[in-house]
Amino acid sequence: MAKRLDLKDLNIYYGSFHAVADVGLAVLPRSVTAFIGPSGCGKSTVLRTLNRMHEVIPGARVEGSVLLDGEDIYGPGIDPVSVRKTIGMVFQRPNPFPTMSIRDNVVAGLKLQGVRNRKTLDEVAEQSLKGANLWKEVKDRLDQPGGGLSGGQQQRLCIARAIAVQPDVLLMDEPCSALDPISTLAIEDLIDELKQDYTIVIVTHNMQQAARVSDQTAFFNLEATGKPGRLVEVDDTEKIFSNPTQKATEDYISGRFG
């Protein structure tokens, strides 16, 4: 678990449109890296290339490489489905299968992989719900629909579903943007616990959240409309927020633009 990601000369295209240019950074294991920047700068686009989710969009392609412990996830013969098992994704809005039970939501990925043993599935469901700090709240209603949970509980259910297949990396695309402050705090506390076992990359528009949860922060920016987004600066979060090297970074985190 908790593998290193290295992005090298990453360029992302949608058809002829050059969306993101020349990104290079290292994401260290057992740490949280935050992607910040104004809307349209490419941070979510970069996030989705880290497990090849962008490929669901027609015309999407990448140049450069994304290495997971030295292996290029875009290399010949690499199955995108196996990549997404190793590098899990938690989306902006909670997306449990609404009519599926809480238990079945958690183990849906395992069932797709052919796991059918009930004891194994029950053990994984319990372990994953405990890992997502949700077990105590739902252990007496595992057969009820996941869609009946609160928004914050649904997001933790989605995190439980993601970790049930034992990924090495967790990607989170604004996981708290649709949640209230109390639920947001619960997710942030969970992220701090999860980084002991996983490599985590989070996209957030909340500067305070980035400062609270991340060890490293990468700031992306857009030069102009129609131009590709670029990585401006990446460093330890404390340094990014206290003494950034680029003026654009300072202007963004201080609220002068964005």
UniProtKB/Swiss-Prot annotation:
GO cellular component, as recorded: plasma membrane
Secretion signal, residue range per the UniProt entry: none
EC numbers, comma separated: 7.3.2.1
A Pfam family recorded for this sequence: ABC_tran
Enzyme class name: translocase
Annotated CDD domains: ABC_PstB_phosphate_transporter (cd03260)
Alphabetical UniProt keywords: ATP-binding, Cell membrane, Membrane, Nucleotide-binding, Phosphate transport, Translocase, Transport
InterPro entries referenced in this protein's UniProt entry, alphabetically: AAA+_ATPase (IPR003593), ABC_transporter-like_ATP-bd (IPR003439), ABC_transporter-like_CS (IPR017871), P-loop_NTPase (IPR027417), PstB-like (IPR005670)
A single BP term in Gene Ontology: phosphate ion transmembrane transport
Membrane topology (UniProt): Peripheral membrane protein
Domain of life the protein comes from: Bacteria
Subcellular location as annotated: Cell membrane
Domain named ABC transporter: residues: 5-247
Binding site for ATP: 37-44
Listed GO MF terms: ATP binding; ATP hydrolysis activity; ATPase-coupled phosphate ion transmembrane transporter activity
Catalyzed reactions per annotation: phosphate(out) + ATP + H2O = ADP + 2 phosphate(in) + H(+)
UniProt xrefs under PANTHER family: ABC TRANSPORTER I FAMILY MEMBER 17 (PTHR43423:SF1)
Family label: Belongs to the ABC transporter superfamily. Phosphate importer (TC 3.A.1.7) family.
Record's subunit section: The complex is composed of two ATP-binding proteins (PstB), two transmembrane proteins (PstC and PstA) and a solute-binding protein (PstS).
Function: Part of the ABC transporter complex PstSACB involved in phosphate import. Responsible for energy coupling to the transport system.
Protein name: Phosphate import ATP-binding protein PstB
The organism of origin for this protein: Mycobacterium sp. (strain MCS)
